[in-house]
């Protein structure tokens, strides 16, 4: 459910007349080729509501995705998708997994920089997967821009949970001899989450909530988002999120990696992720700009 009509009335149409909005949507997105003034008027008056995907496209086109999240009311998730998602979450919260938990106070970090400078934070995890280690050795001297969202100790010498991001996936594809147009995966067009690890579901929701808001606020112009999912539960989750499999990386010990690509806006229009983005939008806005210079206690956020 969403009070999308109020969003159109109170945010979009304050600065953009209906006729101008209609033309802009038709010119920029093929999804709106069939949109006419009558259908748009029905959206504005609340007589009908576009899909979540089209809602996000409208918010993106008008550069007001944060305002859209403020207005958004959490959407219903199908029972089958909810079951698949909970299988993934339950794996994270397995008692066998929790034995790795630390009693130390944990902090949330966000770091940006060159790949070879930030990679040591995830190296202990990545190196355990032999094929990832080989790729890392091949690309460590390339000029790749990276970002790290992590939860760890105050000095950030030990990450307990993280999302590891690369701007561009073309270097990875070169290492895997993947055919096709590498420009689609350039730093300008693509962001890649090549490895994640979550010590608990609390960490998962916090990091994914921050990540979803980061993507929608700062990188909605990226054409592709590449994400690596590990294990059967990860593969099943990626499929219900609409991912297209690019490659799988076998690992019999730690679980196969399944690399999927997504359209950014279509991915985050999925109710599972859009609901998480909504729940964490205020935490993101209140704290994100401080994270680069000052880590924040997770106990103040969870």
Regions found by a protein language model. Give the residues of each.
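Active-site/acyl-donor-binding loops of N-acyltransferases
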Residues: 219-301
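Active-site-adjacent scaffolding segments
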Residues: 65, 74-86
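Recognition helix of helix-turn-helix/homeodomain-like DNA-binding domains
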Residues: 27-50
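Acyl-donor binding region in acyl/amide transferases
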Residues: 173-253
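A short, Lys/Arg-rich alpha-helix, primarily the initiator
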Residues: 1-28
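Short amphipathic alpha-helix that is part of the acyltransferase structural core
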Residues: 84-138
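DNA major-groove recognition helix of helix-turn-helix/homeodomain DNA-binding modules
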Residues: 52-68
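A short helix-loop-beta-strand connector motif used in the catalytic cores of GNAT acetyltransferases and
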Residues: 139-154, 158-161, 168-171
């Amino acid at each position: 459910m969403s009070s999308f009509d109020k969003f159109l009335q109170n945010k979009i149409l304050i600065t953009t007349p209906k006729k101008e909005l209609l033309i802009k949507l038709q010119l920029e997105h093929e999804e709106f080729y069939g949109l006419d003034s009558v259908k748009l008027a029905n959206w504005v008056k609340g007589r009908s509501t576009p899909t979540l995907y089209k809602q996000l496209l409208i918010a993106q086109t008008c550069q007001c995705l944060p305002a859209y999240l403020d207005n958004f009311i959490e959407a219903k998730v199908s029972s089958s998708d909810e079951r698949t998602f909970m299988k993934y979450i339950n794996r994270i919260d397995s008692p066998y997994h929790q034995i790795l938990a630390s009693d130390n106070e944990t902090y949330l970090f966000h770091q940006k920089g060159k790949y070879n400078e930030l990679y040591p934070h995830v190296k202990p995890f990545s190196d355990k997967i032999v094929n990832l280690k080989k790729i890392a050795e091949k690309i460590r001297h390339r000029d790749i821009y990276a970002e790290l969202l992590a939860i760890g100790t105050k000095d950030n010498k030990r990450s307990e949970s993280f999302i590891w991001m690369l701007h561009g996936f073309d270097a990875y594809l070169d290492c895997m001899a993947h055919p096709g147009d590498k420009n689609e995966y350039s730093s300008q067009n693509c962001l890649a989450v090549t490895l994640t690890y979550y010590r608990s579901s609390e960490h998962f929701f916090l990091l994914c909530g921050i990540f979803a808001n980061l993507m929608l606020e700062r990188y909605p112009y990226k054409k592709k988002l590449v994400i690596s999912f590990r294990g059967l539960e990860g593969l099943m989750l990626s499929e219900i999120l609409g991912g297209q499999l690019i490659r799988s990386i076998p690992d019999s010990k730690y679980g196969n990696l399944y690399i999927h690509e997504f359209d950014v806006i279509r991915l985050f229009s999925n109710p599972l992720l859009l609901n998480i983005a909504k729940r964490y939008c205020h935490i993101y806005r209140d704290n994100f700009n401080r994270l680069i210079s000052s880590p924040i206690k997770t106990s103040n956020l969870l």
